[in-house]
Amino acid sequence: MGVRRFLNLFYDWEQHKLGDIGTLKNGMNFSKEAMGHGYAFVNLQNIFGNNVIDNHNLEFAEASEKQLIDYSLQKGDVLFVRSSVKLEGVGEAALIPENLENTTYSGFLIRFRDEYGLNNNFKKFIFAIRQVRNQIMSQATNSANKNISQSVLENLTFNIPIKEEQRVIGQYFSELDNLITLHQRKQL
């Protein structure tokens, strides 16, 4: 029998590998000449410390029509940091909250495209829990930076509740996140 949680739900959570419930794709690399003009793209700095991408502070780089399709960002996609100077930064994740037309993402990131139907608010928080973060960080390789590969993320295991419980959990943590943000603004 499942553990009692939100809404008196008693369903067991199912364990899944990330690679079994969606697809992963590394981002694109840009030359120096391609930077500063063209189309919007999401970079590392847009993810660190954020669980949702704010599309108002994006950089620009050239991209072909094919790249705009291959490296597109759709509502519900999650971007993971592939390479970071600090171990704590590798594997940080942020949700794409809406379709970002004509927007790509950096080669320092990996896109997860959900095929399972996870709740978007649930996705904002599930990849930040200690169990998931520890799995990712324990698999990071060491060079000049800490790195993870697609295969590390494909093999990432985590538990998923039924859709209604995902919705309730996601809503709860979104409201808590908003309350914390409001409290921080009041202190400024």
Predicted regions and their residues:
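Amphipathic alpha-helical segments with low aromatic content
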Residues: 1-14, 162-188
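Non-catalytic DNA-recognition/assembly elements of restriction-modification systems
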Residues: 7-28
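Short beta-strand/loop turn elements enriched in aromatics
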Residues: 33-52
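A short beta-sheet element
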Residues: 43-44, 49, 58-128
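Short acidic/His/Gly/Ser-rich catalytic and metal-binding motifs that mark active-site loops
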Residues: 50-54, 146-148
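A short glycine-rich beta-alpha junction/loop motif
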Residues: 102-108, 141-167
